[in-house]
């Protein structure tokens, strides 16, 4: 990974006339803009289909893509939808936000129409996709079709025969729900087709894609339903223990995530085959992967199932470096960003260092006056080169919102570090972005909202809350020429410019000959 810069913007946050960011013309225009702004990377959030709460970190599958990302414009061009049909659908009235309720009610009927008009059963490309991805697609498509048949309830509430995947039940539902299953396969085919076209365009224009995979999978997922042996489940396929975080200075109860925990002894016996397959597949979709909650590979927090808080949990040992040695032997060296934030011990630091993966630094964590002063790991003078610096992540306040919310003494600490006691408070975000850009971190990634100077009304997610998360998106027109030039200049000034996209200033041989003549 060369010294460079990137921008964090979820696919959902792209502007769109149809209610949510997707693989439409806006995505290609954003790639063009990244190129003009001197960027090398576009970081996104997990691509999977979201469940209740709309979090991309709680997905129905670790392999499937979110059908909401399928471009309706592309389906119109293909002739399987009309512009009138799409314009008549109600996706919500606010251009800068996402109405997931209306999205569910309007998007799927349109996608179903597109499927019914596509005649995919005679499409060789579709048939090849289904065959090549049968190892995960078959279970996922059946899972989604059965879930729809049971009114969307979790698989743990399905009828006993299909809940436990008895052979006769699997055969029955595959016959009974044939067209619903084919519809789900069609959605994944279109997702993959459009995503690969977008990725190819980005790579052709010098932009690499940073994907994101959660360490855990959702209990209500095709993965747990189809492969209960991978997880800490009891005889009824219910969790024995679930994931979360212990109490800390921010939460007296800790965080209860509820994801099933892995049976790491079983994974070790199989040579981590499921994990290797998961990572290999994810690297087909993205150039670099950020692995969420990396500290969970060193130690993970185990909470007895049924607890209402995380107070009674305890730490257990994870697979450690063994998993990543197996990964490298199977896949070769891959570019990973280790999300090593939160409660970090010396053991976690050793794992990150031993893996060789860059860890993460977040400027918003650097100026807490209750913390370790100048020894704070997140202060730029303490960075090593092999790290990725962010002003904030999707889980943090925007940098402007953070400046507005921190205590007075922390704000003074910011000004002291910047040697800036006179700039208006509303302009400090630019100084913090510049500080991140000039740090020795190999890669600097800035959330789009921070470059735009937006406050917390444009925050992506507030952990441990529900309701207004994952909804923000660009309206269109915000990425002005002035902003483009400012970001390009920052990249050039601090040695992060993507030179592969810069026009050469050296004349070619024909031009030189013409000058001589």
PLM features: residue spans?
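In a subset of proteins, long, contiguous C-terminal domains/tails are tracked
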Residues: 454-517
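Alpha-amylase-like alpha-glycosidases and glucanotransferases acting on alpha-linked glucans and related
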Residues: 10, 16, 54-188, 217-445, ...
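Trp/Phe/Arg-rich N-terminal binding region typifying the photolyase-homology
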Residues: 1-80
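Outer-envelope exported proteins of Gram-negative bacteria
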Residues: 45, 208-210, 214, 288, ...
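Conserved, well-ordered alpha-helix/loop/beta-strand core segments that scaffold catalytic motifs
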Residues: 184, 188-217
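Conserved alpha-helical elements of sugar-nucleotide-dependent glycosyltransferases
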Residues: 26-27, 194, 323
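Surface-exposed amphipathic alpha-helices with a cationic face
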Residues: 35, 195-205, 328, 352-353
